[in-house]
């Protein structure tokens, strides 16, 4: 045993074996529990409309207005002029 004196007049008795006797608990009930595995990812809902599937062309054909080609030729000409 050793006595330590402090500046404020306090005296403390310290056991020499005190520092040697401190260890981390190793019992199973003192251990940090392992985390359980993560749950699986949430499954995506099935698409009702079938997005991403290749569609067939419409049975009646695509709508083709008669002046559509004229519109694009005017736009192309105006862009070429600038």
UniProtKB/Swiss-Prot annotation:
The entry's keywords: Cell cycle, Protein kinase inhibitor
Residues passing through the membrane, by range: none
Gene Ontology biological process terms from the UniProt entry: DNA damage response; regulation of DNA endoreduplication
GO MF, any single term: protein kinase inhibitor activity
Tissue: Expressed in columella cells in the roots and in root meristems after induction.
Biased composition range(s): Acidic residues: 8-18
Region (Disordered): 1-26
Up-regulation conditions: Up-regulated by double-stranded DNA breaks-inducing treatments. Up-regulated by zeocin treatment. Up-regulated by DNA damage and oxidative stress. Directly regulated by the transcription factor SOG1. Down-regulated by iron excess treatment.
InterPro entries assigned to the protein according to its UniProt record, in alphabetical order: SMR
Domain of life, source organism: Eukaryota
PANTHER family hit by this protein: CYCLIN-DEPENDENT PROTEIN KINASE INHIBITOR SMR13, CYCLIN-DEPENDENT PROTEIN KINASE INHIBITOR SMR5
Record note on quaternary structure: Interacts with CDKA-1 and D-type cyclins.
Protein purpose: Probable cyclin-dependent protein kinase (CDK) inhibitor that functions as a repressor of mitosis in the endoreduplication cell cycle. Acts as a potent cell cycle inhibitor, regulating a hydroxyurea-dependent checkpoint in leaves. Essential to activate a high-light-dependent cell cycle checkpoint.
UniProt-recorded name of the protein: Cyclin-dependent protein kinase inhibitor SMR5
Species for this entry: Arabidopsis thaliana
High-level lineage: Eukaryota, Viridiplantae, Streptophyta, Embryophyta, Tracheophyta
